[in-house]
Design a protein with these regions (language model features):
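Short alpha-helix in the alpha/beta-hydrolase fold that links the catalytic acid
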Residues: 96, 205, 214, 228-237
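Alpha/beta-hydrolase fold nucleophile elbow
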Residues: 142-155
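Acidic catalytic loop of the alpha/beta-hydrolase fold
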Residues: 222-227, 253-254
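Catalytic histidine-centered segment of alpha/beta-hydrolase-like enzymes
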Residues: 251-261
């Protein structure tokens, strides 16, 4: 190969080796977080269609105004804090929550999602989860208090739920299509990249699991190509508390909730906690 040709090839290789990781590093928020914002008119329309759901706001320590949907349950019912997937606008759960009528629900809008202000990151999602927990946690003289708090995380939300369970006392944890860490999932999908060096939002649930003693329901989709069940199994095996593994046969990552055993297994778990 002539020296000029070799030089050109080396330049192309250098651009690829440096440029691709740099691009991934700079654009990782767009790859991880896919927020769907709601206008004031859309929020009002949702409120009209789901009259039992209440639009609630809280102010974070940095002044950001964050939003959630509160669907009260029966008197003295546990409250489920719901954290959705990376492209999920959670108001759809106002209709789905009727499938689990024995509990109340708090459907959390991440920053930049729904009616919440700001921009999402691992740290802001974690801080806001604690904010919502503290707002509804058992306390005296509060009309919002719940006697028990459960956390429910789906996909990306599993990382938020696990971290909250590690930082606050929760009475039960439900994880749907969860991962061990965002780093491990990213490395699976991008084996040619040094993901551990590039990723700012690690969501390392695996390191927290051995310190969590709350009962766990782990629901996985056997045909999940986005977060293959092997990642959930590592998290499940590391969990310190009582646990149950529910595989949804033939379900994919985005179709788990359509499986006939999805709500059946969730309700069984919830009812066992209440008995």
């Amino acid at each position: 190969m002539e020296s000029g040709t070799l030089s050109a090839v080396l330049k192309v290789v250098a651009v690829v080796l440096i440029g691709v990781p740099l691009l991934v590093f700079l654009l990782q928020e767009r790859l991880i977080f896919m927020p769907l914002r709601l206008s004031d008119a859309a929020v009002a329309d949702i409120q009209t269609r789901f009259a039992k759901g209440k639009s609630v706001f809280a102010q974070a320590a940095d002044g950001t105004r964050v939003h959630a949907w509160h669907l009260p349950g029966p008197s003295d019912a546990p409250l489920v804090l719901y954290f959705g997937g990376n492209a999920e606008e959670v108001s759809w759960m106002l209709g789905e929550a009727n499938a689990a009528p024995t509990v109340g629900w708090l459907l959390v809008d991440y920053r930049g999602y729904g009616a919440s202000e700001g921009s999402p990151s691992e740290e802001t999602l974690a801080a806001d989860a604690v904010l919502w927990y503290d707002k509804f946690a058992p306390k005296e003289n509060s009309e919002l208090q719940a006697k028990k708090i459960y956390v429910f995380g789906r996909s990306l939300g599993s990382g938020v739920a696990v971290r909250l369970a590690a930082e606050r006392k929760v009475d039960a944890v439900i994880l749907v299509t969860p991962f061990d860490s965002m780093t491990a999932v990213g490395q699976r999908h991008y084996p040619f990249l040094p993901v551990s060096l590039l990723l700012r939002h690690r969501f390392d649930s695996l390191s927290r699991a051995p310190n969590i003693t709350a009962p766990l329901l782990c629901v996985v989709a056997t045909r999940d190509s986005i977060i293959p069940p092997e990642h959930a199994k590592l998290l499940y095996d590391a969990w310190a508390g009582p646990k149950r593994w529910v595989p949804l046969e033939e379900a994919g990552h985005n179709t788990a909730d359509a499986h006939p055993n999805y709500w059946r297994s969730i309700n069984l778990f919830l009812n066992e906690r209440s008995s």
